[in-house]
Amino acid sequence: MDSNHQSNYKLSKTEKKFLRKQIKAKHTLLRHEGIETVSYATQSLVVANGGLGNGVSRNQLLPVLEKCGLVDALLMPPNKPYSFARYRTTEESKRAYVTLNGKEVVDDLGQKITLYLNFVEKVQWKELRPQALPPGLMVVEEIISSEEEKMLLESVDWTEDTDNQNSQKSLKHRRVKHFGYEFHYENNNVDKDKPLSGGLPDICESFLEKWLRKGYIKHKPDQMTINQYEPGQGIPAHIDTHSAFEDEIVSLSLGSEIVMDFKHPDGIAVPVMLPRRSLLVMTGESRYLWTHGITCRKFDTVQASESLKSGIITSDVGDLTLSKRGLRTSFTFRKVRQTPCNCSYPLVCDSQRKETPPSFPESDKEASRLEQEYVHQVYEEIAGHFSSTRHTPWPHIVEFLKALPSGSIVADIGCGNGKYLGINKELYMIGCDRSQNLVDICRERQFQAFVCDALAVPVRSGSCDACISIAVIHHFATAERRVAALQEIVRLLRPGGKALIYVWAMEQEYNKQKSKYLRGNRNSQGKKEEMNSDTSVQRSLVEQMRDMGSRDSASSVPRINDSQEGGCNSRQVSNSKLPVHVNRTSFYSQDVLVPWHLKGNPDKGKPVEPFGPIGSQDPSPVFHRYYHVFREGELEGACRTVSDVRILQSYYDQGNWCVILQKA
């Protein structure tokens, strides 16, 4: 049904429903992806719902499209719910438009998906992936035979251990067995004084000797971890602890191929295919500097070519499809290090870092000290760069401000660079922030702002018609201080006054939708305004620290190695060190330190410079901000402890929990 001719005759109920969905698909593509459709016929079509991102493979879609004519090209961008088809002639594309619009196909999971087609004038897709493996990374194909693979898999006994010769655990996203030494996930290390009895299995001996002879490895391993992954399981991005193991990390893939994601601090991501029966060897930069992990999913985006070759996945969107994962078992071999690590990457090396991470605060005094060092001081340092990334107002906040009556007095508590102070010219808005440098930026923009603590705002009680607090309360380090911040906001409101509050959510994936924080494009150097409290950070490696002494006291904190159990369960951090979060990944603790990679000169008036090249030994300064990320219902629960207030609305907005309060 062509929407341009809908006025020529009366549409049926079914046709109207289809037309609404087709128009919605057009608007969604334009709004979220910038893809503009045209009203006239062309050779090219965009196929909404027909993409790798929603489980439709090239092998499924191409035969459907070819029923309408010769397809010159089928472009399927990775992780996108649409594809582009270019036919040989316009007549063939018109036939596909009429025939396939509204057609149901079954994806690889057996679910029905309806296709919506629209014409496009130009098909362009910017390739961003590099075409080289991380330095020091090697993949050796067919390292063992299929018979040897079967023998190794059959040697693994997943029944509970009774002889304590190896340690077995069932983690949320995989099963593991340790040999030689047990890997302790609570501290991401091994106890070098307590080797497991039995050593490595005898069956591995001949393989290790062969790899040594052929020069694939230089050290004979004395520790092995067997991981078993069901389809849909994975392991978070991490770096194996420097001080725990020698340079080589060696992994043998059995049972099924897999795509492993490698990420450099500069934000470059390299997906690497590990074929069945292949050997992955990580040394040097790839072992010490790049994170590696396996995304939890049931299908991998791979090359459509017949042979699944090892190495980087092609960036050619005309040669991508989906590969269904099978049961994969990996044998990972390491050599336990007996001396401190002296690698060439001291900024990310736990042996060469000098300071220890802060502990979780156990008193109000400790919480105040933590906030001073890991919130207030950090924002003073990063104010210029932070402001350069905070320019696009969030739609729901704009909606709240524009709905207020003309002449309302509004306070923005924690106003940052003041991006909301000028949204509605009919309001009288004042802002306050703990950072002098951010307040100075507000004043440069001719906004009314002053420096103060959000727990003690020097404004008369009951004098505000409304307040907003955006991405502020999650910086307070105890529940009592977070409630006190809410009470201070309510104190400012007149009876009937409203407050809008945003905090960062622990649930960065909600209702089966990932937040923009998780989906963010690490490689794009253009527009980057995200909708959460740390979205300007593009670099996934979080353990980089500055060796610059007291000037960056917030940056000398080691990270938690995310090779521990997956999932989003909050860890008990009382009486323990605060973990450092991996940027653009799910949260594993509610109380975390989040890295900020300072780009260019931190001075406000100077331009921001790009990151240095891969392998640079002078990475950008890294600061760490304290956050308490809120679980679902936690913000509402805190609000209910405040007297004389009721919750008008609560909602989730792109990785944030939000409430609108009204003072009684």
UniProtKB/Swiss-Prot annotation:
Interacts with TRMT112. Belongs to the alkB family. It is linked to Intellectual developmental disorder, autosomal recessive 71: A form of intellectual disability, a disorder characterized by significantly below average general intellectual functioning associated with impairments in adaptive behavior and manifested during the developmental period. MRT71 features include impaired intellectual development, global developmental delay, mildly delayed walking, poor language, seizures in the first years of life, and behavioral abnormalities. Residues 515-575 are annotated as: Disordered. Fe cation binds at residues 238, 240, 292. Zn(2+) binds at residues 242, 341, 343, 349. Catalyzes the methylation of 5-carboxymethyl uridine to 5-methylcarboxymethyl uridine at the wobble position of the anticodon loop in tRNA via its methyltransferase domain. Catalyzes the last step in the formation of 5-methylcarboxymethyl uridine at the wobble position of the anticodon loop in target tRNA. Has a preference for tRNA(Arg) and tRNA(Glu), and does not bind tRNA(Lys). Its cofactor is Fe(2+). Gene3D superfamilies: 2.60.120.1520, 3.30.70.330, Vaccinia Virus protein VP39 (3.40.50.150). Residues 220-337 form the Fe2OG dioxygenase domain. It is found in: Cytoplasm; Nucleus. 2-oxoglutarate binds at residues 227-229, 328, 334. Binds 1 Fe(2+) ion per subunit. This is tRNA (carboxymethyluridine(34)-5-O)-methyltransferase ALKBH8. One of its GO terms (cellular component) is nucleus. Keywords: Cytoplasm, Disease variant, Intellectual disability, Iron, Metal-binding, Methyltransferase, Multifunctional enzyme, Nucleus, RNA-binding, S-adenosyl-L-methionine, Transferase, Zinc. GO terms for biological process: DNA damage response; tRNA methylation; tRNA wobble uridine modification. It catalyses: 5-(carboxymethyl)uridine(34) in tRNA + S-adenosyl-L-methionine = 5-(2-methoxy-2-oxoethyl)uridine(34) in tRNA + S-adenosyl-L-homocysteine. InterPro entries: AlkB-like, AlkB_hom8_N, AlkB_tRNA_MeTrf/Diox, ALKBH8_RRM, Methyltransf_11, Nucleotide-bd_a/b_plait_sf, Oxoglu/Fe-dep_dioxygenase_dom, RBD_domain_sf. Widely expressed, with highest expression in spleen, followed by pancreas and lung.
